[in-house]
């Protein structure tokens, strides 16, 4: 028994030594998804996840370095070793779990459609949906929720909906609205926001916080939400950090700090600063 305990203790020390001996952990982020992560006018990263990641790193025995990467290639670049963890508003989904391991979730935000004020799609408000449905969790969508989705599809039939490619939002349209709407794909949310404002999109679908950030900018003053807020299903189980499957030490270290920051209210305060509300997990 003593030998077993000694072996376990030695392995624990080896694990900590491996983490501590790493000079830095490289964090991959998009830098184009405000208020989650974004490059400001000075070319500096800012946003809820930048504050979150920096605070997390201050609690770890390592130095952290941020690396920006276009969204389409963000998981392939992780697997190729460009960085060690993704902190980039990435929802935890079963499809992504086939390639990477996720930390525990640290933030969560619903998804919603947005349109131009005065368009025919404005005003698909809760009174237009069976039972006054204003939130739809796809994990347990009953008859009323399914009816709400059906009415939304009917109202948006033939419309052009713009979304960022390789996202949960594209997955939702492909699964639930295929054939009913024309899906137009973009490399970044900034790109589809510009096209919505210019009238080249009938609607966009994105995280609520991202759309609010757009609405509060000069370019988004004529934008309004429409339809219910979606969560669950293809939208995943909150936002987490993604690591290579073999990097169990990094995963363990981040999970420990994520739990600490949740328990002491740090993550909640960060989300209130950037989203105006608590979306911590």
Language-model features: locations:
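Bacterial N-terminal signal peptides
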Residues: 7-15
